[in-house]
Amino acid sequence: MVFKSRIKWIALFVLILSMGSLVVHLSMTKSSGVQLAYSARDNLWQDFDSLLGAQDFRNKHLWRPVKSLETLQPYANPRNSYPAPSSKNNGFIYAKIFGGFDKIRSSICDLVTISRLLNATLVIPELQESLRSKGISNKFKSFSYLYDEEQFIAFLKNDVIVMKTLPESLKAARKRNEFPLFKPKNSASPKFYLEDVLPKLKKANVIGLIVSDGGCLQSALPASMPELQRLRCRVAFHALQLRPEIQVLAKEMVDRLRKSGQPFLAYHPGLVREKLAYHGCAELFQDIHSELIQYRRAQMIKQRFILEELIVDSRLRRDNGLCPLMPEEVGILLKALGYSQKAIIYLAGSEIFGGQRVLIPLRAMFPNLVDRTSLCSTEELSELVGPETPLPENTYKMPPRKSDKQLKEEWNKAGPRPRPLPPPPDRPIYQHEKEGWYGWLTENDTEPSPSPMDLRNQAHRLLWDALDFAVSVEADVFFPGFNNDGSGWPDFSSLVMGQRLYERPSSRTYRLDRKVIQELFNITREDMYHPNRNWTLRVRKHLNSSLGESGLIRQSMLSKPRSFLSHPLPECSCRTSALEDSRQIQSDDGRFLYGGEDECPKWIKSAGVEKSKTDDGDQPDYDHDLLAEQSETEEEFAKSKVASAFDQDEEWDPND
């Protein structure tokens, strides 16, 4: 009897102990779940605060300017005799621009240059993505949705006469389509405008241009027209100022990124459906995304934009450098360079095809990955958009339920007996399955026309790209996911790289060769997360060399012939000290690939000396990246590997 009572007490004790253990585990799970459910913005600032004073400064050289480019200074002023425009000119040019932010920016620069070439007055272009018919706020017109009109007109007063609208006497004739209309390609030459367009302009006094290729004038102008190239620079880098509201919010975003005094890196993935379809990169994605890319590629083949087969080997295209680097690959490259897991990375781009799923590996490697939605509140973004008229929601309506009478009639009209049992009732259809850019794939063979809400969202993308552009230009480091794609269209990353090269040539901008990078990835693709030391050093050598002379030469050879704004050297820069002749490199046609800049005026030299003194006083000197990495001992490398292993999130397995 006593023995049985002891067993009961032991069983009761075990039961209480089990219940207590279960309660403790549940409470721990709940508290950890609450801790994990934080916003990216709160985590960012908490991370900053915890890192103050504890940040490892061994890798400060990864953020430092490139010393070999510090002699370059922005200088787009006219060099020779440059007469001011006259009101007695050859007439007016009005234009309609189609496309996104990058195409708009490049096209406006070409239009101003053409107006100067033809001695004509330019009417402020109409941006078709931001017309009021697209549902934007009545507070803005098309051009003023993005840019400051008054600044644009005032800055160009010594280059081109710019008017907000056509004179009243000509508006009616334009509505009746009485004026010649041209649809130039982005490779149109000055000869085309002087011989074909100018005579009609003089005759009709007004011509119209429809620009849809991201430009209407060839990038490489004759050597006799350097002033027109400098005019392009003055338009892109001075006259085209974002409207004040965008500038203020962009500056606030940069201040928030640098709140703790730490630098940040901007990364633009370049995952845009149009570019992916053009280059045949569908197989790099899965399921619905691959189908959407192939559908767009079929459309481009039908429209004769592409003269290739529909189905191509995407992996072969990737190995040739024709597809963007995936975010996972970029994360591995940044790790190989030595960037800490705590590095702050700003994700630019209004369109990231593939959604958040393709960003998961990068976010796991760098938790401080933020974008405009995590830096700005909903109210701040709404104020930027302005007051808009409410649009009807695109709600999916369930088909009406059939009555008993209808069901009975269908049963009677069915085939001969014995009849099979009716199918079970359909599962409920949820609204999110029929909404969005992918909803049509399950029901239709053709993509439906954009709804009013889709058109409005496309206009909003211009604002998001403008914010990202301003932040990327100000970043301490810029890493492009897809530039120099060879399509002939301007791209976001190339425009950012060009503006950074003009404003701050020594800022760290990686100009990598994707073909070389993919060759390196093919060596270690089976074990990308644990590369050997030789692979890491080869990656570092290539990426660090792309920051300086070799990267600029490659950019000049590949990017400049298609987009002058992506590489405005040597026309729009000067050097505070002359470059040795032995270091200047020219192409076969005599064009400078590296060097060839004029010597800076004294006022630029003196300003540059003062700035360099300030910079030297603020920051200590660091050895060159490549030399520092070559001198790294085996022991230091092992320590860095151990440190990165401790930085790794314990719950994240790279092989999952």
Curated annotation (Swiss-Prot):
Broad class of the protein's primary localization: membrane
Region: Disordered, residue numbers: 381-426, 631-656
Skewed-composition ranges (Pro residues): 417-426
Keywords, ordered alphabetically: Carbohydrate metabolism, Fucose metabolism, Glycoprotein, Glycosyltransferase, Membrane, Signal-anchor, Transferase, Transmembrane, Transmembrane helix
GO BP: fucose metabolic process; polar nucleus fusion; pollen tube development
Glycosylation site list: N119, N444, N522, N534, N544
Pathway annotation: Glycan metabolism
Pfam families to which the protein is assigned, alphabetical: O-FucT
Disruption phenotype: Embryo sac development arrest. Unfused polar nuclei. Pollen tube growth defective.
EC assignment: 2.4.1.-
Record-linked CDD domains: O-FucT_plant
Ranges annotated as spanning the membrane: 9-29
Mode of membrane association: Single-pass type II membrane protein
Family membership noted in the UniProt record: Belongs to the glycosyltransferase GT106 family.
Protein name: Protein EMBRYO SAC DEVELOPMENT ARREST 30
Native source organism of the sequence: Arabidopsis thaliana (Mouse-ear cress)
Lineage: Eukaryota, Viridiplantae, Streptophyta, Embryophyta, Tracheophyta
